[in-house]
């Protein structure tokens, strides 16, 4: 399913990659330059990043699996004890295959890949897709984690899981984390998330993900929700795992019912 055309400012600050190259890459994904957009996709020498030009203090959004919070989470996080690991059913030597159908910036998927799961990513928004692709390509070159990520984490060239064939593209687990409107006042929402939400908005068609997810999942579908959100599709899960601010609603696949 092709995403409708996205207009955003395209800027190159790179000495190696020209604006023409960035524009051509974006055109392949139905992204066009729109000079009045407050959002900009910027190519620097280091990476591709998203900025909100009218709120520069919010900083840039980019995908970084190698340093920063992801490095800390990989080295000092809970690993198998993390809530997402328990929710997808990691236990003992059991490492389920996973399709993350709302990949976003890839953080939960990275945690699962670091533990040893093979994770395939699907991202519906073309700008986020390019940010994710850029972050993955950089991480694949890393001496410490590059080889592991090449084996365990890949971005599929589709923009919706309904493009996948349940007969050949199935996985043990399908993971869904659709964007949900924040209850807090915007000042309390993390800066990065404010930029991200301005681009993506709330997932108004999130309910359309559950049925194809159930068709693709051999064992379970896991839906991450804010603790105050209703069930996806209004459908009662088989059980839920609750954390401080979220819950994971778990729907067992047909083979597990």
From Swiss-Prot:
It is found in: Cytoplasm. The keyword Methyltransferase applies. InterPro entries: 16SrRNA_methylTrfase_J, SAM-dependent_MTases_sf. Pfam families: SAM_MT (PF04445). The keyword S-adenosyl-L-methionine applies. Its main location: cytoplasm. Specifically methylates the guanosine in position 1516 of 16S rRNA. This is Ribosomal RNA small subunit methyltransferase J. It comes from Haemophilus influenzae (strain PittEE).
